[in-house]
Amino acid sequence: MSKVTFKITLTSDPKLPFRVINVTEDTPFTAVLRFACEQFNVPWQTSAIITNDGIGINPAQTSGNIFLKNGSDLRLIPRDRVGGL
């Protein structure tokens, strides 16, 4: 099985920390979202992943589909920070 690599950046932190995650193509993207959130200590239930262009990603897909459609460079947004000042 082929693997895909995602670079996920935490946008709510001014230092913009990131994690590189390698998973198989058939891994559900919800698992990638949950793992990334655990790495950044943010709640996965209220977080979203977007592209660098600001387009939201539906996590109910395989990691391979997300990689093909959106590439490897993604951003994590804890939803409690969305729209806040």
From Swiss-Prot:
Location of cross-link Glycyl lysine isopeptide (Lys-Gly) (interchain with G-Cter in UFM1): 69
An example Gene Ontology biological process: response to endoplasmic reticulum stress
Principal location class: nucleus
Cross-link Glycyl lysine isopeptide (Gly-Lys) (interchain with K-? in acceptor proteins) per UniProt, renumbered positions: 83
Propeptide: 84-85
Keywords recorded for this protein, A-Z: Cytoplasm, Isopeptide bond, Nucleus, Ubl conjugation, Ubl conjugation pathway
Gene: ufm1
Subcellular location per the Swiss-Prot or TrEMBL entry: Nucleus; Cytoplasm
GO cellular component: cytoplasm; nucleus
Job description of the protein: Ubiquitin-like modifier which can be covalently attached to substrate proteins as a monomer or a lysine-linked polymer in a post-translational process called ufmylation. Ufmylation on lysine residues of proteins may play a crucial role in a number of cellular processes.
Family: Belongs to the UFM1 family.
Name listed for the protein in its UniProt record: Ubiquitin-fold modifier 1
Leader sequence segment: none
Pfam family, one: Ufm1
